[in-house]
């Protein structure tokens, strides 16, 4: 049957964690107050504000309090959908104004071209919104890579630590589990994908990184799909 599709995690796998933690997250924390004040009546932003109140169990929170909640969630690396949606919108402005370029490991840039030439389908799965993923890959330091991808998945598909999220991906792309390889640096995500029947491979870019019983690679150069 063989592998027909590869699903990649982003942070720590295709993208350096320090870019997320030291560039993108601080940028969103700093930009949130003005962004919410200027866009609070935009339907999408308004929905995110309402969802934040609901999740925080603070239905009467004013805009300043909502901003504080969201900024705290960034610091806690919460995977809340309204936060991830707002971050995607904020980062879109940052990319548009050339505040930063999306960091992509060079070995993935070369590998994604190789996989595409092999007619393998390529998807990304991240706790960051689909829009944020598209921005990352379209404004990457390796150029626009979006045409190499067949799709992207985020928290709307499910929690990355839950088996059901990977079952949902399989249903969406209409492939059997053994036809799909999931690559991530996080053991718990690999366990969830494995429980759904997917093939798995752990990306270990740091020698101090925790590993499990999964096949490991330290670069996409080492990932050969026959």
Swiss-Prot record:
InterPro entries referenced in this protein's UniProt entry, alphabetically: Enolase-ppase_E1, HAD-like_sf, HAD-SF_hydro_IA, HAD_sf
Enzyme class: hydrolase
GO MF entries: 2,3-diketo-5-methylthiopentyl-1-phosphate enolase activity; 2-hydroxy-3-keto-5-methylthiopentenyl-1-phosphate phosphatase activity; acireductone synthase activity; magnesium ion binding
Cofactor: Mg(2+)
One Pfam family here: Hydrolase
Functional pathway: Amino-acid biosynthesis; L-methionine biosynthesis via salvage pathway; L-methionine from S-methyl-5-thio-alpha-D-ribose 1-phosphate: step 3/6; Amino-acid biosynthesis; L-methionine biosynthesis via salvage pathway; L-methionine from S-methyl-5-thio-alpha-D-ribose 1-phosphate: step 4/6
EC number, as in UniProt: 3.1.3.77
Gene Ontology biological-process entries: L-methionine salvage from methylthioadenosine
Catalytic activity entry: 5-methylsulfanyl-2,3-dioxopentyl phosphate + H2O = 1,2-dihydroxy-5-(methylsulfanyl)pent-1-en-3-one + phosphate
Cofactor remark: Binds 1 Mg(2+) ion per subunit.
Keywords: Amino-acid biosynthesis, Hydrolase, Magnesium, Metal-binding, Methionine biosynthesis
SUPFAM superfamilies: HAD-like
The keyword Nucleotidyltransferase belongs to this UniProt entry's keyword annotation: no
Family: Belongs to the HAD-like hydrolase superfamily. MasA/MtnC family.
PANTHER family tied to this protein: ENOLASE-PHOSPHATASE E1 (PTHR20371:SF1)
Subunit description: Monomer.
Protein role: Bifunctional enzyme that catalyzes the enolization of 2,3-diketo-5-methylthiopentyl-1-phosphate (DK-MTP-1-P) into the intermediate 2-hydroxy-3-keto-5-methylthiopentenyl-1-phosphate (HK-MTPenyl-1-P), which is then dephosphorylated to form the acireductone 1,2-dihydroxy-3-keto-5-methylthiopentene (DHK-MTPene).
Record NCBIfam families: enolase-ppase, HAD-SF-IA-v1
Name used for this protein in its record: Enolase-phosphatase E1
Organism of origin: Shewanella oneidensis (strain ATCC 700550 / JCM 31522 / CIP 106686 / LMG 19005 / NCIMB 14063 / MR-1)
Gene that specifies this protein: mtnC
